[in-house]
Amino acid sequence: MKYLTKSRVIATIAMLGCLSVSAWAETPTNQPESLTDKALKHEKLGVVVESANHKFAEKYRLQYDSWKATAESTDRSSALEADPRLVVLWAGYAFAKEYNKPRGHYYAVTDVREILRTGAPKDENDGPQPMACWTCKGPDVPRLIEEKGERGYFDPKWAKYGAEIVNSIGCADCHDTTSKAFEEGKPALRVARPHVLRALESVGWRFEDLDKHGKRVAVCSNCHVEYYFKDKKDVTFPWAKGVDVDSIEKYYDESQFTDWTHALSKAPMLKTQHPDFEVWSQGVHGKNGVTCIDCHMPKVKDKDGKVYTEHKIGNPFDRFDATCKTCHEQSKQTLQDRVKEHKAQVKEAMIRLEDQIVKAHFEAKVAWDAGATAEEMQDILMAIRHAQWRWDYSAAGHGNHFHAPDVMLHTIATGLDRVADARAKLGVVLTKHGVETPIVMPDISTREKAQKAVGIDIAKDQAAKDEFLRTVVPQWERQARERGLLPEVTPKSVTTPKVDAK
């Protein structure tokens, strides 16, 4: 393997699982109050956010067209159909209704509108979800937070600003698009979500003190992180004790936070989001200063030889010469085979853990039905919580098997330990209450059968969602066009620029 092109190395504080900023920091100078300082005081940042993506199409044509090409990632296949165990793991939570495989940034707003999890609100005060569900979906979010303040943004229901959040993840999520530097063609990277600035500060990643490589990672942490809704409203990163699986679990346990109570086992559950920043930081690439941008947004050339940053975020192997080959001497096939092997190992272990947790949930329900007491079940439910947290920390990320396969295998192994403890104790409780073991497990071989087993009526939810998409969403888009947040005519096609690796 060649020497890495970057000399900077992230130092990991093992005790806390925190990241050290020292290797990524620039020497600060006397400057006016920073955005981080304002965020820490919960003040408005005083920024201008031009959130309409289409307004940058002409000046930054190469970047814009490559960003727009994320629309080619159209596969929205159901993860619940591929693995019906997920329905049981999330029983009682909206993810058990619909959970699809991720697709391109271009669809961020469309997908959150259409997913069953956001319900079918009839007006701005209706629906099951808070505004927080929009927070990662596009640059209209930091614009609204600046206009309304954090309370004005986070307090309402999800439907309140449906006509305002219409631009999918784009330019102003990462760039200060109104700055002189951006006008001159410089990156002008910026984080304009106050809660993200506070979270970065909590792990020593003060945004203003980061060098350009650190800032490239930090803008991705706007969204590619684990988070929860504090007080069921505010997007919060649970990093106060560190970013590894044990530190975040400890944070949640000590704050007595629960995403939901499981419909079968009654365990106080946690739902991991997508801890990509956290897992990357623990892996070989993160520890050696290789950033998200290096692998997913490399420098490429257009047909005339002009160099620009590829914004069609995707698999690094699709741009092998511009990504992997800048550090590795091995062939593309060799590296692909290695990644495939890691993925298979992690997936196999993950399925084993899923199987055990599913059984634990059903066994716990039988125990409750047989008359088990809260005292008898207390330790069992916490073991189930911890086992599933470890499974989800491994499963919810994008490419965890690549970013840190050793960390994932260790995390899953500790999850297997926790669920083994839960099931051993369940065996004792079941026997005590006269239940023969093993219990009879229901058929969960398909998504439909699994949803029936946990009592979900999808037909009713889908009918309501269809009506919402037919009546409410067109009104949102009409209002957005009137305000200039969307172009008057939606582009009919997507042009992918032809590029060669630099």
Curated annotation (Swiss-Prot):
Q: Where does substrate bind?
A: 227, 274
Question: Which InterPro entries does this UniProt record tie to the protein?
Answer: Cyt_c552, Cyt_c_NO2Rdtase_formate-dep, Multihaem_cyt_sf
- What keywords tag this UniProt record? Calcium, Electron transport, Heme, Iron, Metal-binding, Oxidoreductase, Periplasm, Signal, Transport
The cofactors it requires, by name, are: Ca(2+); heme c
Chain positions recorded as heme c 5 binding sites: 285, 324, 327-328
Query: Where is this protein chiefly located?
Result: periplasm
Q: What EC designation does it have?
A: 1.7.2.2
The record describes how the cofactor is bound as:
Binds 1 Ca(2+) ion per monomer.
Q: Name one GO cellular component term.
A: outer membrane-bounded periplasmic space
Chain sites annotated for binding Ca(2+): 226-227, 271, 273
Per its UniProt entry, which superkingdom is the organism in?
Bacteria
Which positions are annotated as binding heme c 4? 292, 295-296, 403
Per the record, the GO terms for biological process are:
anaerobic electron transport chain; nitrate assimilation
Q: Which segments carry the region annotation Disordered?
A: 481-502
Query: Function, please?
Result: Catalyzes the reduction of nitrite to ammonia, consuming six electrons in the process.
Q: Which family does it belong to?
A: Belongs to the cytochrome c-552 family.
Protein name in the entry: Cytochrome c-552
Its taxonomic placement starts with: Bacteria, Pseudomonadati, Pseudomonadota, Gammaproteobacteria, Pasteurellales
